[in-house]
Amino acid sequence: MAFEIAFNPSGVIERAKTILNDYGAKFFTEDKLWVWLLDGQREIALQVPEATSVTAPLELAPGVTQAIPATSHCLIDVPRNVTGEAIRPAARALFDEMRPGWATEGGALIVKHFIYDPERDKKTFEVWPPAAAGAAVECISSAMPDDSSMASNLFAVDSRHANGLTDYVVFRALNKLTGNPQFLTHAKNHFDLFMYSCGKSADAGLLLSQREAA
């Protein structure tokens, strides 16, 4: 008889149990499946930062260098001041060439540009003019999911990733059984499906080269 699975994290766990044919938790405990589900949400946040985007006002520190919210892992955009004036992205190289002393200029309450180089530091960005005490901007950043999403049974990522999360949980489960070549193939297939759901191509060979520890 057909039955409906809820569209929430518990539903992802139920789908994974169905695919793994392990309703009795003979091979994988439910606690372990939940851990993998949280891992999957964190991986989605890294692969698709917009999936966990959070928009909030951010009070700036006096000066040029600013930190993104502590609960986030990268910056997405700084679109405007809290008073409404637009902020445009800029390249540090251009400022260094055109205004060599830009980082030492006087502080202002209205920011005009922000500079972000995630290859150097994902957790900080710079603003111009340097911020004066009391300056604040609208900050869009990518939050890193924590355990609270599991306790509330709510997705920490966009719910469109539910199917991808199911594939991730199944991948992690089968990756514990890769001593069997058949499980290795199935694990790779589910990992590929997860990565495709994130808009990425995947070669899971390196991830599956060793059996996952218990």
Question: Language-model segments: what does each one mean?
Answer:
Residues 1-214:
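Glycine-enriched, solvent-exposed interface loops adjoining structured elements
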